[in-house]
């Protein structure tokens, strides 16, 4: 059943692999059980399976999507859910495709759920998905450096931050805005990047100090989430 992902375009397939790998590492840092970690990882791998039925001209469009195109793109969540629910072996993992674009503050889709109603596995997958979508060189995004990505994700996961930081941030459609992601999970993401050198990025102590000074954060050196 998982072989159907091989028919996705090469970028979406690689993105699914990245999100699954990062989700697994986040679960490990959260000290999740082995069973829950395996479950989350498969949910993450399947999270974009609904894109099998999104027209290529929309999925691979190099420019920004129109409102109409974005509405079509959003259907990949419910399409993915339906694919999983129709297969007995995939049915347990249907939460990954359905909920990975929900936001803690209720601004997500397809159901506009808030934190108390969003499954925890989906909250983890959302953070991994946000990170990989920003770091990866997408057809419809300009490549953003790892340093800026980490700063933006963590900065916008802190309480009291505005939704619109600047005109520059408005270009980053996937950035984690106020209330959108779970900051506890973001902390684990940050440690994953530093400790596991995700995307083969090395970080010096001076780099860490710069981020901490810029964002006035103390979470960087926390050993437990």
Sequence positions of predicted segments:
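Histidine- and acidic-residue-rich, metal-dependent catalytic cores
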Residues: 1-219, 223
């Amino acid at each position: 059943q998982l072989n159907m992902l091989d028919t996705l375009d090469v970028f979406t397939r690689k993105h699914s692999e990245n999100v699954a790998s990062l989700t697994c590492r986040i679960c490990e840092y959260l000290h999740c059980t082995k069973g829950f970690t395996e479950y989350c990882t498969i949910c993450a791998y399947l999270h974009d399976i609904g894109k099998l039925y999104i027209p290529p001209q929309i999925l691979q469009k190099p420019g920004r999507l129109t409102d109409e195109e974005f509405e079509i793109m959003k259907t990949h969540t419910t399409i993915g859910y339906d694919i999983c629910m129709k297969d007995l072996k995939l049915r347990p993992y249907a939460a990954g495709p359905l909920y990975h674009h929900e936001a803690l503050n209720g601004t997500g889709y397809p159901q506009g759920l808030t934190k108390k109603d969003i499954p925890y596995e989906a909250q983890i997958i959302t953070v991994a998905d946000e990170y990989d979508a920003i770091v990866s060189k997408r057809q419809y995004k300009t490549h953003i450096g790892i340093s800026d990505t980490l700063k933006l994700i963590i900065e916008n996961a802190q309480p009291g931050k505005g939704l619109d930081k600047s005109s520059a941030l408005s270009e980053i459609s996937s950035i984690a805005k106020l209330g959108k992601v779970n900051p506890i999970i973001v902390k684990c993401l940050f440690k994953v990047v530093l400790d596991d050198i995700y995307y083969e990025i090395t970080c010096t102590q001076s780099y860490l100090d710069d981020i901490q000074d810029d964002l006035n954060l103390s979470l960087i050196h926390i050993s437990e989430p």
